[in-house]
Structures are given as C-alpha cells and as structure tokens.
C-alpha cells in the first residue's frame, strides 16, 4: 500500500521511516517533507501541511491507503476532518478533539471536570488581573500562552521579575500573537518529568514506551524552553507502577472524557507528566506524537507500525509491542541562537561521516544547488543510537555529534545523564 505523512520535521521523518519498514508498504510520501528524508527513500510531495484540497487530490491520485497527520497546526485546522469527509482514511484527531492541545484553558477545565491530576491554575485575559494573581501566588510559578506557540509558550519563573516579564511579553507585547491573549497561570510542580504517549481510539488506550525530553536549551536544564533538545526511551528511574498509575488515572479518564464531551479522539495522545510526591500529574497534553520523543520511541516498536495504524482506523485491536530491553538516545543539533534568533542557510559539515548504525532524522535542513545540506530551521536534525545501557549509548553517540561540530550550531552534552 501507499501511505502519506503530513509534516516536515524530524518527527515526520521518524514516522515515515518506520512505516517504510512495515510489511505491505510500497511507498511512503511526505507532504511537504524535507530534503533529508529522500536519503531514506521517502518521496516528497510539494504540498503544504494545511492545503486540504491539495492533500485530498494527491491522496486520491496516488491511491493512498491512509494518511498520518504529524504536526499540531494541521490537526487544529481540521485537515483530518477534511480528509475523512472526502472518504480518505486519516490517523489523527479531528479539530474538536485536537483542542486538548490547542487550548491550555480548555485542557485545564477538562481536567478539573474529570478529576485528572494537574497543577492548580487560573486563566486570564486581563493583564492587571493576571499580575495581581501573580503577586498573590508568588514564585516559583508557571505562565503559559493558551494557544499554540511551537513549544515555546511556557515560562517557568523562579523570580518575580521573570514572571512579570513573561506576562508582559505574552499579554501586552502579544509575543505569540492571538495564542497569548489568554494566559494560564499555574502552580509550579516539583518532580521528575516524563512523556507518556499512547495510541488512542475512542475509549481504547494503548500506551507506548515512555520517554524523557529535555526542554531547556542549555546544559543543566538552563535557558529558555525549546521544542526539545534531545530525548531517550525508556526512562529507567520511572517505575512500571508509576506508568500504570498514569494510564489508569490520566490516560483512560482522558480518553473516556473526550468521548463523553463529543470529542471522539482517534490518534496519538501525548501526556507530558511530572512525578510529584502525590503521584503523576499532567503538565500538558498534546494531540500528536512528540518531537523529539518520536525519534527515540518508534525505533523501540517491535510490531508492524503500518498494520497497527490500519487496525486502529478499522476499529480493530492493534498489535502493540515495544522492546523490553536496551534503550534509544537522541540528541538534537540546533542552530546557534535557537530558540530566539538564529540564521538559516548555514552549511552542515560532517554528515557523510556519521556511522551507519546511527539514525539521522532531518528536521530543519534542505539541500542547496550543489546538493549540500544547509540549515533551514531552529532544530536542524537529531542523531539517535540504540544501545544496551545509557552509558553505552552516550559513549557511542556523542563522538558522532562531535563530527557535526561547527560554530553555527550547538547541542546539549548532558542528554541522558540522569539515566546513567
């Protein structure tokens, strides 16, 4: 069968590559994809991820068996709705279900209604009221833009000055446009963070291997929040009992609650969780695969990925099996200055020297007229390595990262140290 993946990042590269490794899959197309995907025999289609008519037209012409929509923007713009209305099978939540990611305020109200553990919070549209609440609660405190901000709309403020500045940026300077006209202020939670993704079809939930993302730009979890600077899966210091508690108290009630609300969720539910003294609590929900978590979780999937998605689309029970031993480590190479101001068009060096057993997932790259790869985004690519232990993975992966050393790029050297 022929399949279509919508999106252009490292996540979509990982999804497409895993689909190609499935039985009965002839071709995988990616719209719009990126030039680096071609190296893995993924075929690019020059259609934007929100061009509904273009995607429908292509899916019909190329006899696409099903479409996987990767990023949050097309999900919230109703690309899955449009494909399904045109009679094309599409995996991902419809717009009304993707709202669990699209609005932090909606997610908070939903969690309160269904008693899903999360931090206490309040939502504001008035700057003066929000500032008064800040002063009343004190620091540390967390300030979130209500809408989509590419993973950068969250400030964990340890000082009041930082909290007020974040609030000003969002509400007065409109740093994230309409996304931050409404702001959620929530209590700071202390604990170990981890990502739990699951395949969801209505009330059916099939959890994946857990991962730990590294959101801050710099070593030691310092600097601004990013889309993610690296990840690994599984997370040895999070017990099976904690994962089971998260499934029972968070994922299942969420899936059931969404059905009850008339927001049937079929797709990937991503729970960004924190293990507190009172058990796991929700930091955020996403309505799709995480990036960079996908690049370290999907390589651990033992069952046939395309067959799994196909089963969910036909309301059948999927075969979901993950490796029980070893781990996968992934480190992001980012453009200097990311996540704030960075240049595009810088040449990547050392790519051809990367060991064959290290996976390269391209994100913000493209080829110039000479066929050389240049940067085309903040997060440029991710290298991933499977190994038996974290110290093996780090020992094997970081020399490969060093081959990419170049003043125009940077990466964190401490990804995975917590799991050693």
Swiss-Prot record:
The keyword Acetylation does not apply. Pfam families: GARS_A, GARS_C, GARS_N. Its cofactor is Mg(2+); Mn(2+). Binds 1 Mg(2+) or Mn(2+) ion per subunit. ATP binds at residues 134-195. Transmembrane segments: none annotated. Signal peptide: none annotated. It catalyses: 5-phospho-beta-D-ribosylamine + glycine + ATP = N(1)-(5-phospho-beta-D-ribosyl)glycinamide + ADP + phosphate + H(+). InterPro entries: ATP-grasp, ATP_grasp_subdomain_1, PreATP-grasp_dom_sf, PRibGlycinamid_synth_ATP-grasp, PRibGlycinamide_synth, PRibGlycinamide_synth_C-dom, PRibGlycinamide_synth_C_sf, PRibGlycinamide_synth_CS. Belongs to the GARS family. Mg(2+) binds at residues 284, 286. Its EC number is 6.3.4.13. It comes from Listeria monocytogenes serovar 1/2a (strain ATCC BAA-679 / EGD-e). GO terms for molecular function: ATP binding; metal ion binding; phosphoribosylamine-glycine ligase activity. One of its GO terms (biological process) is purine nucleobase biosynthetic process. It is an enzyme of class 6 (ligase). This is Phosphoribosylamine--glycine ligase. It comes from the Bacteria. Pathway: Purine metabolism; IMP biosynthesis via de novo pathway; N(1)-(5-phospho-D-ribosyl)glycinamide from 5-phospho-alpha-D-ribose 1-diphosphate: step 2/2.
């Amino acid at each position: 069968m022929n399949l279509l993946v919508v999106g252009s990042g490292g996540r979509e590269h990982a999804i497409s590559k895993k689909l190609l490794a499935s039985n009965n899959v002839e071709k995988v197309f990616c719209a719009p994809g990126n030039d680096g995907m071609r190296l893995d025999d993924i075929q690019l289609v020059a259609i934007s991820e929100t061009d509904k008519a273009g995607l429908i037209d292509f899916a019909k012409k190329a006899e696409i068996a099903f479409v996987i929509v990767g990023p949050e923007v097309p999900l919230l713009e109703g690309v899955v709705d449009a494909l399904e209305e045109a009679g094309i099978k599409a995996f991902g939540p419809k717009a009304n279900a993707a709202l669990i990611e699209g609005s932090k305020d909606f997610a908070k109200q939903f969690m309160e209604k269904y008693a899903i553990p999360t931090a206490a919070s309040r939502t504001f549209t008035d700057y003066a009221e929000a500032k008064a609440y800040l002063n009343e609660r004190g620091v540390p405190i967390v300030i979130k833009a209500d809408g989509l901000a590419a993973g950068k709309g969250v400030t964990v403020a340890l000082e009041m000055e930082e909290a007020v500045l974040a609030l000003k940026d969002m509400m007065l300077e409109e740093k994230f446009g309409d996304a931050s006209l409404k702001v959620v202020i929530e209590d700071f939670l202390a604990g170990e963070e981890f990502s739990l993704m699951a395949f969801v079809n209505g009330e059916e939930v099939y959890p994946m291997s857990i991962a730990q993302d590294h959101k801050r730009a710099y070593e030691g979890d310092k600097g601004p929040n990013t889309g993610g600077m690296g990840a690994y899966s599984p997370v040895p210091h999070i017990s099976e009992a904690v994962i089971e508690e998260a499934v029972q108290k968070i994922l299942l009630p969420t899936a059931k609650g969404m059905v009850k609300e008339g927001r049937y969720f079929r797709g990937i539910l991503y729970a960004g969780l924190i293990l507190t003294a009172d058990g796991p609590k929700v930091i955020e929900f996403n309505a799709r695969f995480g990036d960079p978590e996908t690049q370290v979780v999907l390589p651990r999937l033992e069952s046939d990925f395309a067959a799994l998605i196909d089963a969910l689309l036909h309301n059948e029970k999927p075969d979901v099996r993950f490796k029980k031993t070893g781990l996968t480590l992934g480190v992001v190479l980012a453009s200097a200055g990311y996540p704030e101001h960075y240049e595009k068009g810088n040449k990547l060096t050392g790519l051809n020297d990367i060991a064959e057993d290290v996976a390269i997932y391209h994100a913000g790259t493209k080829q110039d007229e000479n066929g050389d790869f240049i940067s085309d985004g903040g997060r440029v690519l991710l290298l991933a390595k499977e190994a038996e232990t974290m110290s093996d993975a780090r020992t094997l992966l970081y020399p490969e990262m060093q081959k990419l050393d170049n003043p125009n790029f940077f990466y964190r050297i401490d990804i995975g140290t917590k799991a050693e």
